[in-house]
Structure formats: C-alpha cells, structure tokens
From Swiss-Prot:
Species assigned in the record: Mycobacterium tuberculosis (strain ATCC 25618 / H37Rv)
Taxonomic placement: Bacteria, Bacillati, Actinomycetota, Actinomycetes, Mycobacteriales
Pfam families reported in the protein's UniProt record: HTH_3
Alphabetical list of SUPFAM superfamilies matching this protein: lambda repressor-like DNA-binding domains (SSF47413)
Keywords: DNA-binding, Transcription, Transcription regulation
Name under which the protein is recorded: Uncharacterized HTH-type transcriptional regulator Rv0023
Length: 256
C-alpha cells in the first residue's frame, strides 16, 4: 500500500518482459530517470507520466492508482492483466523485441508492431467521452503514436541501409500509426490542433510552406498538430490559416 510497492510491481512486469529501462523509455517517452523514480517509489509521479507508462505497457487506465491502494500490488497487477481481452500476438511480439534477436531489423520490426498493438489496446479501453479525463487520455495516446512513428521511421531507415526485406512491413506499420493518430484527432474534431491537422492535409501545401505562412519551425508545426501547443504570437495566423482552408474546402464540396 505504497508507492514503493506499486513501483516494484511495475518493475516486475517490465522485467518479466525482459525489457530494460531504456526499452520502456523508448516505448513511453518517459526518461529513464523518471521511470527509475516511479519504480523505486522515490517521488510521486506526475499524472502524465503514469498515463504514458500505463499506455506503454498496455495496461488499463488507472492501473497505477489501483496498485497504490492494493494490499498485494503484484496480485492486483496479475488480476488486471488477466482481466484484459486476450491479445497473444501483442504479448508474443513484445517479448520478441528483446529476446528473439535474429537480426537488428527483425527486432525493430517486432518492436514497431508491438507498439501498434499496445496503442490499439489502449484505445479499446479509453474512458467514456463524458469523462473529465477523456481529452487528456486522447492527447496521451496521440503522444504515444507520435513517439512510435518516429521510432518506426528510424527503424525503416536502418532497414533500408541494411538492405533488409522488412522495409515494406515497417512502412505499413508507419502508415497504420499515422492513420491511428489521425483517427484519434478526429475524436476531438473541434479542437484547434485537430482542425489544423486537417487543414494541413487539405491544403496540399508543403509543410515548409505552411510553416512559413504561420511563422513557426518544423518541430513547432508537429507540436501544434498533435499537442495543440501553439506559440502565442502564431495563434492568430494558425486560426486564419485553418479558417481559410476550411472555407475553401467547404466551397469545393458545395460545388460538387
């Protein structure tokens, strides 16, 4: 009934999958130091950290909170995992990431697929749309998608350089992750980040041109599209761009 016990249960689950802290950090976007603090119960973890760890491990939302109050965190974690819908592919592939090291590219492909399976599993257990935490969880899963996309892109580059035959499958995983990211944004259709993401796709303009229009860099563009983090000075231009593209798109549809 403490952070130490809850963290120990999380660590045991990680180790049972033969994941290092670095593996979990790559899967969650949380620093290894932050994960170490959580597993040791050294500090009270931030809510977003807990959500990322739950998502990365494919655990139901609220798992960590349940472990904090459980008389036997290990037994409670086992119960929660057993209660999840069976997904043997995800479990097998997640284990394969570290254990079945036939080649570097096989590991990278397995890891990309495990990430996609884990994200889909989390989406299946999202809170109700009426929940106060619904948008927070959506943004958390989008962040996981973005992280997984960047890893898959790097994996594809490694596979190409190695002349591996997994490049096609990695590209399929990357496209699936991007489709998932877009679908998650569609769950918040009125948010400015979702509207901006749609506008970027509908405009047919190169990203560099859109960035020049609103006066931000490429990294800031990505943050706006996924996290809604908009520099104060760019906010009027972002809104103007979105309004212009939406009006043009609506006019085009009206003529069809």
């Amino acid at each position: 009934m403490s952070r130490e016990s809850a963290g120990a249960a999380i660590r045991a689950l990680r180790e049972s999958r033969d994941w290092s802290l670095a593996d979990l950090a790559a899967a969650t976007g949380v620093s290894t130091m932050g994960l170490s603090y959580l597993e040791r119960g050294a500090r009270k973890p931030h809510k977003s950290t807990v959500q990322k760890v739950e998502n990365g491990l494919g655990l139901p939302p609220g798992t960590y909170s349940r472990l904090l109050v459980a008389a036997d965190p290990d037994a409670e974690l086992a119960r929660l995992i057993a209660a999840q819908p069976s997904n043997p592919t995800a479990v097998r592939r997640a284990g394969a990431v570290v254990v079945d090291r036939h080649s570097d590219t096989d590991v990278l492909e397995g890891y990309a697929e495990a990430q996609l399976d884990a994200i889909k599993s989390v989406i299946d257990r999202l809170p109700a749309t009426t929940s106060n935490e619904y948008e927070t969880y959506i943004l958390s899963v989008i962040a996981q998608c973005v992280k997984a996309e960047m890893l898959a892109a790097s994996s594809w580059r490694v596979a190409v350089n190695a002349g591996a035959d997994s490049t096609g499958r990695l590209m399929e995983h990357l496209r699936a992750l991007e489709a998932t990211r877009g679908a998650l944004l569609e769950r918040m259709p009125t948010s400015l980040s979702a509207r901006f993401d749609r506008a970027c796709a509908q405009s047919s303009l190169p990203e560099a041109v859109v960035a020049a229009l609103i006066g931000v860099g490429a990294d800031e563009m990505w943050d706006i599209r996924n996290r809604g983090v908009i520099p104060a000075g760019a906010l009027p231009r972002v809104r103007a761009f979105v309004d212009a593209i939406e009006a043009s798109h609506d006019a085009d549809e009206g003529q069809q």
